[in-house]
């Protein structure tokens, strides 16, 4: 699992499929450049100032990184870019609920792509 760090990668993902849950907004796009690297998916994390100050934004991103590390190796599809956008509930939702939100968003996005999660 690689990280998205460049702005154009985030903008491309924003033009893809978007699924909103109480704690997470998931943006997914297929990336043809990753086809040459089998088994690779990329993930990025964002938290805007609507979440709160720097401490709250950093905490939200840490929670998103932990959720992605737990879920994406099992449910993510290679060849896709995933961007997890923090919402206000990211900070207060129990971690199990955060994981459930991510799994449901992934399943919905993959169904929309025509590549359901196994």
Predicted regions and their residues:
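Positively charged, solvent-exposed patches that mediate nucleic-acid binding
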Residues: 1-118
